[in-house]
Amino acid sequence: MSHLVWQKSSYSDAEGADNCLELAQGNGDHRHVRESDNPSVVLTTTAAKLRTFILGARAGEFDHLI
């Protein structure tokens, strides 16, 4: 997965601390998620599933977990 271009949120620590999730677009419909402090562990999902999750997060469906 070294060929992937990983993207962090603009809300991540600007000083480069390992405190965020990173996303990358893979081949076809694959989307990848990893933690910046443990980049060797990667979760792979589809664009549709990731979109559904992000929309739920924006709507506050997971606020009770933070």
Model-predicted segments: where are they?
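Active-site microenvironments of metalloenzymes and redox enzymes
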Residues: R58-I66
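A short, structured beta-strand/loop element
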Residues: Y11-L55, A59
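Histidine (H) residue identity feature
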Residues: H3, H30-H32, H64
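A charge-rich, low-complexity, intrinsically flexible signal that marks solvent-exposed coils, linkers
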Residues: M1, T45, L65-I66
